[in-house]
């Protein structure tokens, strides 16, 4: 089996369906005796350019080890799902298991915030003046 990195973008109005889509796609992989090494739901993010007059999309990243037939099945599922705006499947040499830069940045941002998700006045002020 080969290693793959898969990113797909979902229409922002369909964000509530993303957990079900993830479950369905991971089910396809595990049924074929594949392994999911990393799964990250990046949430809604700004697009670099409009796609179908949309400026945001819901991003999901998966690193998997699966047979080529399973990946073809996933690509077909992406193609026939109207909620999936774009997808990219890349073959990789090794399994990637560490957090992506996107996930690390989110973790760092969350750790800087207080328990209620708010930054303290000192943190916000220091950031404003560039300290």
UniProtKB/Swiss-Prot annotation:
Function text: Binds together with bS18 to 16S ribosomal RNA.
GO biological process entries: translation
Similarity comment text for this entry: Belongs to the bacterial ribosomal protein bS6 family.
GO molecular function, one term: structural constituent of ribosome
Naturally occurring in which organism (per UniProt): Shewanella sp. (strain W3-18-1)
Annotated CDD domains: bS6
GO cellular component, one term: cytosolic small ribosomal subunit
InterPro entries xrefs: Ribosomal_bS6 (IPR000529), Ribosomal_bS6_sf (IPR035980), Ribosomal_S6_plastid/chlpt (IPR020814), Transl_elong_EF1B/ribsomal_bS6 (IPR014717)
Gene3D superfamilies membership: 3.30.70.60
Protein's name in the database: Small ribosomal subunit protein bS6
Disulfide bonds: none
A Pfam family recorded for this sequence: Ribosomal_S6
Organism lineage string: Bacteria, Pseudomonadati, Pseudomonadota, Gammaproteobacteria, Alteromonadales
Gene (name only): rpsF
């Amino acid at each position: 089996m080969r290693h793959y990195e898969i990113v797909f973008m979902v229409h922002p109005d369909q964000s509530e369906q993303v957990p079900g889509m993830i479950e369905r796609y991971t089910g396809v992989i595990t049924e074929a005796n594949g392994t999911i090494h990393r799964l990250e739901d990046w949430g809604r993010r700004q697009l670099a350019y409009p796609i179908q007059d949309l400026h945001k999309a819901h991003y999901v990243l998966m690193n998997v080890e699966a047979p080529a037939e399973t990946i073809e099945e996933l690509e077909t599922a992406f193609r026939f799902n109207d909620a999936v705006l774009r997808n990219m499947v890349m073959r990789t040499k090794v399994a990637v298991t560490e957090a992506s830069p996107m996930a690390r940045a989110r973790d760092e941002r969350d750790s800087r915030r207080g328990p209620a998700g708010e930054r303290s006045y000192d943190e916000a002020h220091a950031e404003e003046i560039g300290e």
